[in-house]
Design a protein with these regions (language model features):
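Catalytic palm subdomain of template-directed nucleic-acid polymerases
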Residues: 423-453
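Common nucleic-acid-contacting/processivity interface regions adjacent to the catalytic cores
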Residues: 133-259, 339-399, 417, 426-428, ...
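Active-site-proximal helix-loop-helix substrate-binding element of RNase H-like nuclease domains
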Residues: 4-8, 12, 43, 52, ...
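Active-site palm subdomain of RNA-directed nucleic acid polymerases
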Residues: 124, 393-420
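Catalytic nucleotidyl-transfer cores of nucleotide-processing enzymes
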Residues: 80, 210-375, 491-522
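Alpha-helical interaction scaffolds
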Residues: 1-18, 24-26
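Proline-aspartate-enriched helix->loop->beta-strand connector
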Residues: 21-45
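C-terminal, non-catalytic extensions of nucleic-acid polymerases
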Residues: 449, 453-692
Length: 692
């Protein structure tokens, strides 16, 4: 290898290898180690191997304190051993990715190869010509070395782009916790509060055991107006839960206990709820020195609580970094030089991480408050936050409808959809009543931007001031800003929509950006080949006709028929192999389709004596499944497989491409097309006639 960063140590045997590795480790003992799946593979393997070859005393030298310990944990139904090297923090990059990367929770596969393809457009070194890594090691040692080096390079490149280690370290320093505590929000907030109070010479109360008796009411999500909408504007409440905590001064020491209620509070408390407050049916004029939340709780407003104070400091910091990030994003859009664009993108990532660290801390506060393991857990406080959130979003929905109905002399619902902290406003009627001549899309977007800024935004601010005054808030902190401006939006159900965005938070796009939420193309359970085509098709929906769509689908049918089975199969995670297996019939009645496929795969591997070449599918693993035409050698309608379908199965000709196409592509696309009143194919152009 010609890489200057690589030093090759030639070792005479495994004992020599372990000795040299340990010597190098001790001489350059790391503070943090990372890699892909290091928690469950690399670290246990290193410790177990050094222990077996050299003994426990030598293995313990991996720790600067000569201390290793291990614990059992359950992962996807499997018992796993986690090893801890005292004094060396282990931040597994796969965990950082799942927790903190923008798309970390919705990937089809979490193999390093798959994630590197998604994020970097490059993958691992392929060794398809060999049956296993062992064979690669034995027959092509140089490629085996290059393969391992490439894995490390991919992690370095992922970090260069995503800055997740930087984010984790920022969070840890911010919260004064250990690096590994970035995966535990209650621990982070316990430390944040402890340090905040100690600085003010306030002693933190001892931790008590709490029991969570039941789940509490969550956020409000409106039933959307299903279908196509032109000229959509979305508005977003900035950091809703942290701001609710500030607005209502929600904190353990400001909560008024029932025994301290005065006569006014005793009357109001049992009557308070979201509906009553929306209609302003309660007379709150007699309240003094307290604010009221929709779950009938009162919080003192005579002095700011420690939680709201902490939120305010964090929010100001986040705002500063987010502003710098948006400036860098606009600079990136305007820059033409590719090298300069790369540098600017790194700057965007850095500012994004800094603002994200604050956002994570802010938003995890509410998560911690709802956890029974949190030192300051109180169901009344958690409920006060969620129900105050419901009140805020429904309040503005009612107000904006009243405003637009008065302006346009109508009685319609102009709020297409709303959820926890966002509303989507139909400005189509306003645009058509104001702009009488044909205009370019960007001209209309510019008009919408002006209307939002000069008319709607001030009205929103005024409406929220009215709410704050009514509930006697400590401070008016409901800050709702315009987010996306789109020429078209399609809703199919709650939290399932597509927006063709031309302007987002003031950043003007040269080409529209698709914002897709909850639909099949961004689901990890959709086949990769189908997902890409869905994105293309939806882009076409925004500009083309029904005929264009039908032609696109017809062409893709041809392509689909020739794709490898791995690209068109459904990704899933498998659980319940033991639960659903049956010694007599192989699987029980009611077995989920992908689990059935996994049991059939394992059985067929055994039948063909292939278990030494291909590993059996294990509980909790990611797999893919495909439908099969009958009759076939498997003697069933489905097969699952881990990454690739073994060629020895010899069942390629039995893959049911018709069913795969219908279930993976046509069915989800039809949901969107039905909203537009469009068909997937011209009459007489059926799947049966196409595939013969």
């Amino acid at each position: 290898n010609h890489n200057d960063n690589v030093i090759y140590f030639k070792c005479k045997d495994e004992h020599d290898l372990c000795r040299k590795f340990l010597d190098d480790w001790i001489a350059n003992c790391p503070d943090v180690i990372t890699g892909w799946n290091t928690k469950f593979f690399d670290i246990p393997y290193l410790i177990n191997r050094i222990t077996r070859v050299m003994g426990e005393d030598e293995a313990s030298k991996l720790s600067p304190w000569n201390n290793l310990y291990k614990r059992e944990t359950m992962i996807q139904g499997r018992k796993e051993i986690v090893h801890q090297i005292t004094g060396v923090a282990a931040l597994d990059y796969i965990e950082l990715y799942k927790w903190y990367a923008p798309g970390g929770k919705s990937q089809e596969s979490y193999r390093l190869d798959a994630i590197a393809q998604v994020e970097l457009g490059i993958g691992k070194i392929a060794y398809d010509e060999y049956d296993s890594l062992t064979q690669l090691y034995q027959e092509n040692y140089q490629k085996f070395i290059d393969y391992n080096i490439k894995d490390v390079e991919l992690i370095v490149k992922l970090e260069d782009k995503l800055k997740l280690l930087e984010l984790a370290l920022t969070l840890a320093y911010d919260t004064k916790t250990n690096y590994e505590d970035v995966f535990a929000q209650t621990r982070m907030w316990d430390s944040l509060i402890y340090n905040h109070l100690i600085e003010r010479k306030i002693v933190v109360p001892p931790k008590e055991k709490n029991r969570k008796d039941s789940a509490f009411e969550g956020a409000y999500v409106k039933d959307p107006q299903v279908g196509l909408h032109n000229w959509v504007a979305s508005f977003d409440l900035n950091s809703l839960y942290p701001h609710l905590i500030i607005q209502y001064n929600i904190s353990p020491e400001t909560l008024v206990q029932r025994e301290d209620y005065n006569d006014v509070m005793t009357v109001l408390a049992p009557q308070a709820n979201v509906e009553v407050l929306l209609k302003k049916e309660l007379d709150t004029s007699g309240m003094d020195g307290v604010t009221l939340t929709p779950n009938g709780q009162f919080f003192r407003t005579t002095k700011q609580g420690f939680l709201p104070e902490m939120m305010e400091i964090m929010y100001k910091d986040r705002k500063k970094f987010k502003k710098l990030m948006l400036q860098a994003e606009q600079e990136y859009e305007n820059e033409k030089d590719e090298e300069k664009k790369k540098e600017i993108s790194k700057l965007v990532a850095r500012y994004n991480n800094l603002q994200l660290a604050k956002k994570v801390s802010l938003n995890s506060a509410y998560g911690a408050m709802g956890s029974q393991y949190f030192r300051f857990y109180d169901l009344r406080i958690a409920l006060a936050v969620t129900m105050a959130g419901q009140l805020s979003i429904r309040w503005i929905e009612n107000k904006l409808n009243a405003y637009l109905n008065k302006l346009l002399k109508t009685e319609k619902d102009y709020v297409i959809a709303s959820d926890t902290d966002s509303i989507y406003l139909n400005l189509g009627p306003l645009v058509s009543s104001t702009i009488k001549t044909q205009k370019e899309i960007l001209e209309v977007i510019s008009f919408m931007d002006k209307i939002c800024e000069t008319k709607i935004q001030p009205y929103i601010d005024k409406s929220y001031s009215e709410l704050a005054e009514y509930v006697h808030a400590y401070d008016q902190k409901m800050i709702m800003k315009r987010e996306a401006l789109a020429n078209k939006g399609i809703w199919t159900a709650k939290k399932r929509y597509i927006l063709n965005v031309y302007n987002n938070e003031g950043v003007q796009y040269s080409e529209p950006h698709m914002k897709v939420m909850g639909l099949e193309m961004i689901k990890s359970s959709t086949p990769s080949a189908v997902r890409d085509k869905m994105r293309e098709l939806i882009k076409l929906m925004m500009t083309g006709t029904q005929e264009d769509i039908q032609e696109f689908i017809f062409t893709f049918k041809h392509e689909f028929r020739n794709l490898p089975v791995e690209d068109i199969s459904f990704p899933r995670g498998v659980n319940g192999l033991k639960q659903y297996s049956d010694s007599a019939t192989l699987y029980k009645k009611g077995t989920p389709i992908h689990v059935k496929g996994a049991l059939l795969y394992n059985n067929y591997l055994r039948e063909k004596n292939l278990t030494t070449k291909y590993p059996l599918i294990q509980e909790g693993e990611k797999l893919k499944f495909a439908w099969l035409k009958m009759p076939n050698p498997i003697k069933d309608t489905v097969i699952s497989f881990p990454n690739r379908l073994p060629k020895e199965f010899d069942i390629q000709e039995y893959i049911d491409y018709d069913t795969q196409f219908e279930k993976s592509f046509i069915e989800p696309i039809k949901v969107i097309l039905d909203c537009l009143g469009w068909e997937t194919e011209k009459s007489g152009n059926t799947l049966e006639s196409f595939f013969g």
